[in-house]
Amino acid sequence: MTTNTVSRKVAWLRVVTLAVAAFIFNTTEFVPVGLLSDIAQSFHMQTAQVGIMLTIYAWVVALMSLPFMLMTSQVERRKLLICLFVVFIASHVLSFLSWSFTVLVISRIGVAFAHAIFWSITASLAIRMAPAGKRAQALSLIATGTALAMVLGLPLGRIVGQYFGWRMTFFAIGIGALITLLCLIKLLPLLPSEHSGSLKSLPLLFRRPALMSIYLLTVVVVTAHYTAYSYIEPFVQNIAGFSANFATALLLLLGGAGIIGSVIFGKLGNQYASTLVSTAIALLLVCLALLLPAANSEIHLGVLSIFWGIAMMIIGLGMQVKVLALAPDATDVAMALFSGIFNIGIGAGALVGNQVSLHWSMSMIGYVGAVPAFAALIWSIIIFRRWPVTLEEQTQ
């Protein structure tokens, strides 16, 4: 049974299942941002020291995305999803049992291995299973799962960590992953690998200047975002001087705004992806530059977080659309590279935020993040004028 012979309802149900999986994976990626203080207290460490866990996770994903994708390029996709979920669940059990920070980091590396494969195939699978003419909407739905991880997963994980301990947060994610795995087994058809590419695809992709320019833009803008975002929880409490509950509410606002960004992109992304992305980068730049000035008011921080969340969702979606449009003949290789490069940016941003917090002042993370954001804005304007491309231009 192929995705072309099923009803639109079933096709959408499969995309929704992938969106739920995206929610699970992004919850576990984002949730340490809201648990840094609790984990640091548990292991008698500084918050900034624990933050290095974010960089390790992201750079493992970056390093392994392409090798794992190539190793599994001929594996049937349903089977591959099941296997990576098993690794994902087992790693969360180890996170729950972690008796030292080192063991916790090892467990997170296991999660990162599963993450590396998942995000290299998910976008292309969503497009493949979507009803005809609904590819942008399918991507938007996957992104909504990502946004919900921030609006629900991250704050809920933080609340669970506050009241039951951070270990229970990881245990709960593991249980959620198990339920999602059972749904995947029931709902997904056999999905033979296609358009996955191989090592032979790499020279071809590297000879596409538009694609390489998108990759460069991705790493710079993601570095800018995560320089500040990685430490937003301790920033709100230690620099702004607001309560832990407000920090949770702020994360809720930022994530919820991502859903707004997803809706905007779903409606306008096909025709105006380039304009949307450049505008969103400009908005990110403003938010980062105003982070410290806004720290004197809960209302100011709340409004800022809404625009910040909208900007990052549009940026993330726009980058995916352009990568898929520029590499329709090797989508999995291109997306594995994208996932790796995105995580290089996450790790770099978390590391920059770590170093700024340890050796300068955590109050400066917004200003420091604004520097690469400005560079990203200029670069986006240059490349989108030279290589305009929309999802409609994909090879069918």
From Swiss-Prot:
The chain crosses the membrane at residues 15-35, 50-70, 81-101, 103-123, 136-156, 170-190, 209-229, 246-266, 275-295, 299-319, 333-353, 364-384. GO terms for cellular component: plasma membrane. The keyword Transcription does not apply. Keywords: Cell inner membrane, Cell membrane, Membrane, Sugar transport, Transmembrane, Transmembrane helix, Transport. It comes from the Bacteria. It is a multi-pass membrane protein. It is found in: Cell inner membrane. Pfam families: MFS_1. One of its GO terms (molecular function) is carbohydrate transmembrane transporter activity. HAMAP family: MFS_SotB (MF_00517). Involved in the efflux of sugars. The physiological role may be the reduction of the intracellular concentration of toxic sugars or sugar metabolites. PANTHER family: PURINE EFFLUX PUMP PBUE, SUGAR EFFLUX TRANSPORTER. This is Probable sugar efflux transporter.
